[in-house]
């Protein structure tokens, strides 16, 4: 490079990239003297360099530099700083030292070559070394690490440039755990103890023999149970067959039950109440519409009112109910108001509702919070709600909350709930994900479930299956709607919001009064649609799976599955919207070839519920099985048969 007025051209310092034809290799860290012994052949640059061959770079030749270059390694993350903005830094070094500097960039270190007289080479290197040293000092002062850029030295004296030098302090995980436990104890130390056991067994319940109790459970939907406590198992309490057996000591609860007109507890209530009233954590697995809400609400009311710390000062929430959807949250709040006890105040907190109004209600002081995880987590992170005094926690429809991806929000919420609380979990199914959640957040629970553990075949619903085509689905539904009587009430389930809107529009154009319920509608519109359906103003509701849980309308006579749900569990939940509270119901489901993957599972559900199975459905299941076998055979044929032999 020629000099004009002492300033080198910018092209001199442009970073080159040296790569071999196979693999990139970092330059060897050799002393400058050793590298300087390399002749003209030694500084030939590879494919990415600025020059080739055995000659010096043209800029160095033009400048009259006869000495061999001074070569040294530079950490690649310093290259940009050494060059400077627009090359300003390295131009200044070249100008003040009358040298030509070449940087060949590689990882983790780059090769620097300085051309010029020996004195100027040494001066230029000293300038670069001092500049890099200042960069290291600045970094170390900010990070508090004084060995960040120095190579570690092994026992044999070798260096490893990829390992930070110096003795690293070992992390004592046991100490960290101990400190975490101490912090937890300190966090909850000022809270009063919780009273949990409020159960007084009636004479009739205590007189029931084990044989009688087992016989009752078998006759009432085959109730089974398990104690998940480690070690010695606890005996399950006898079921409370009447409301008096459960709440004989709580006349106000009995009065509310009589006002509601209930005759006797549902099976899940009879078995769950003696457990929860004793303060034992509970997992209740049963189909929707079996009275699971009152399983936890009634004992929860008693739990709250009889806490010593709450007498005369209920200004902070003591009970928290988490639900997957706003519809279910509103339904639970409705039940709280219906069975109001001792002036307990509740608030419903959910996404889509007026956030400011919900905050104002919380500020007034409440006893019970019913919430969806997303909105409650939002208010929690904004310090609008204090969960420190929660002593009674409910995870309602836990399987649905996990399906909807709420586990991270649940985890954050429960960090602020005292660990010695009482917890009740309800679920329609018992998959591994719910089992794992129970292990994390419940302590030594008992599990009570109605029917089988995997799925509950709804025996109170007559299930009709129609195997058809996509083109014929609309006409089948029209035929059904035209055959409805004036007292029938139907929920039509569809897979997508757009389908719900499309069907609603077509039916309204045909002078058929309908309402639709899905997530894209405004909250007030959804509430109005649900109210119109409940009161009978409209008798046809078109809904997505959002409404397949928490939709509590007792007089639904039919469920029509226009689209088959994404899995067989949702099918069970959908048809569970009818045949509730001791009534019978009817479901109609249309299937097309697109649904043939679920045909076999659907047959199992129908068989367990003693339903008729159409031949077309059996044929569909057989075709899908044959299709799967064919694909598996094709995959096997495509796989290489063993390893190729090696010949020596």
Curated annotation (Swiss-Prot):
Identification of the protein by name: Probable ATP-dependent RNA helicase DDX43
Pfam families: DEAD, Helicase_C, KH_1
Coiled-coil intervals, chain numbering: none
This protein's encoding gene: DDX43
Origin species: Homo sapiens
EC class name: hydrolase
Residues that coordinate or bind ATP: 286-293
Region (Disordered): 1-60, 628-648
MF terms (GO), sorted A to Z: ATP binding; ATP hydrolysis activity; mRNA binding; RNA binding; RNA helicase activity
